[in-house]
Amino acid sequence: MFDTCGPKGVKSQVISGQRENFVRLDSMDSRYSQSSETGLNKCTLNIQGGPKRFAQGSKASSGSFKKGFRKGSEGLWSIGRSIGLGVSRAVFPEDLEVSEKKIFDPQDKFLLLCNKLFVASCILAVSVDPLFLYLPFINDKAKCVGIDRKLAIIVTTIRTVIDSFYLFHMALRFRTAYVAPSSRVFGRGELVIDPAQIAKRYLQQYFIIDLLSVLPVPQIIVWRFLYTSRGANVLATKQALRYIVLVQYIPRFLRMYPLSSELKRTAGVFAETAWAGAAYYLLLYMLASHIVGALWYLLALERNNDCWSKACHNNQNCTRNFLFCGNQNMKGYAAWDNIKVSYLQLKCPVNVPEDEEPPFDFGIYLRALSSGIVSSKNFVSKYFFCLWWGLQNLSTLGQGLETSTYPGEVIFSITLAIAGLLLFALLIGNMQTYLQSLTIRLEEMRVKRRDSEQWMHHRMLPPELRERVRRYDQYKWLETRGVDEENLVQNLPKDLRRDIKRHLCLALVRRVPLFENMDERLLDAICERLKPCLFTEKSYLVREGDPVNEMLFIIRGRLESVTTDGGRSGFYNRSLLKEGDFCGDELLTWALDPKSGSNLPSSTRTVKALTEVEAFALIADELKFVASQFRRLHSRQVQHTFRFYSQQWRTWAACFMQAAWRRYIKRKKLEQLRKEEEEEEAAAASVIAGGSPYSIRATFLASKFAANALRSVHKNRTAKSTLLLSSTKELVKFQKPPEPDFSAEDH
């Protein structure tokens, strides 16, 4: 529908076959001024103001003048941009798309993914940097300190790959818009999309930290050592790595906190689930153990080097350079080579019997030297042993450490104890916070149950009522898990609320026969107004004679519906309601009546739950609206469905059929009595008029007997007909339910 033509930022739309151009007024920028300047030169008028066809003679001069004018305008435009003139803010994502350079929205999914990957790369970076401390090792055979070349190549390669993520992140920072602080009064705020302002802000905030973090100083030191063969470089490399890695570790570690805070501010949360948050802090604790283990390894090697240096200082055949591998060709090394093993084992022993005083106290580093990890090139065993030592002493706050009097060792132990205390408190606190979010609903339910028990005990409720309250609370918890679904949905926008209600209720509503054949519009209206209800076993939904304030549609469970026709003696009707049935249909008749007042109708039945019941409820006011939609259905199908499933209509139909059947039986019996009477009359007449040879006395007695028989027949017939008529009238007393108004007329 939209395409771009002419200057940048101007869109065109085809309306009724005509192309109409329009420009967003709130997106006007100085960029569009430049584009408009360029577009002006393409119009039919030249700079001198005359028509183009009259200026052909001075085409060369006017062209040069226009070129200079355009360059001057571009210069003024760039100066204005540099001092901040013009509008450089945007609110909507489409404003970012029309910019000349790609500017990312801080809440863009791609940028959020990149930030999460960068946090992961930061964690990997601070995990890789301590591996540089494992490069020095002790050659136990040559009694010298060397550099593990294979491990050095692997570590520097991994560090370089991770630094590439830093460079990519720094490039993204120059193209990521930010919310202007002055626009945070209401809503999201305005995004600053000017690349100059974005770059200025980044340079003033985190650029220096990122630059110090990404400097490849450790790689340069390691590769310089690998490409030189002089053994004296071992000492310089070891000292440089120790200081540079530790110094550069500070900005790398500090960069993680503002980045995670930025993720929480833009994405709302950093860890999507409670388990992810707990695992994140556990990972940080393991990272601290990894750092402590690497420092312990390096300090153990340094402490061993101090002992060797002290022993070498007391021996005239030794110089300090002999203690580092690669110096075998130095002058005087042969004399030292003959005595170094026995001499160093004598002066710096690591396996000393307990009853003897060692010549040199290694303190907390004795375990690293006696285990042989400082002289091993097996990185896996070396790494996990140091990791376990760091985790063990961080968790125990260094309680099992036996230090020497060496100040550096004591300071390291004190720092270890303080760091362990802080990290352990941080880990426990944050893990408790995250894990409590899993059980907060359960705890709220326990508090409510305790309050309910105290209240019932205070009010001295009978045991059966207490049991019903407990059963209802338990059933509601099992169904909702303590979540107030209604309030949760009500806080959402209307269209989203409608879609959620449709997703949750549509399939269940279609199972109700009354709603089965309705159109989508009516079903949406019904779903939007339905409210879920829960009823426990043996609870009464409505009682006969009470006002009906809602119509219930059964989703699960079984109910009993009973009526006595207003308490009339001798009348009792019972039926069962199951999934798909409804009750409270008196309210639908009331809602469809155009002359109904504000008084709610009375219930004609008592409805009791036989099992736990789930239902949807339509209250009276909402049903008024839905019922008004029913009248627009130009079909009798809904009316027939309503009659078929309505308990009122079913009861009336049953009584009506019983009355019709009894009337039929009455007519049959009356017909039979009439035939018997006719037969007896015919027999009596034949006796009288038959000319019998009996005497006149016998004839008189026969006529008298026939008259008495006819009188008894008439009496019995009258009594039976009166009884049948009275029973029929009793059945007909059950009035026909009022007819709902399903017409299409509005009222």
Swiss-Prot record:
Membrane-topology annotation of the record: Multi-pass membrane protein
Locations listed in the record: Cell membrane
Domain IQ: 650-679
InterPro entries, sorted: cNMP-bd_dom, cNMP-bd_dom_sf, Ion_trans_dom, K_chnl_volt-dep_EAG/ELK/ERG, RmlC-like_jellyroll
Side of membrane Extracellular, spans: 139-150, 227-239, 302-407
Family statement: Belongs to the cyclic nucleotide-gated cation channel (TC 1.A.1.5) family.
Its biological purpose: Probable cyclic nucleotide-gated ion channel.
Protein name: Probable cyclic nucleotide-gated ion channel 6
Organism: Arabidopsis thaliana (Mouse-ear cress)
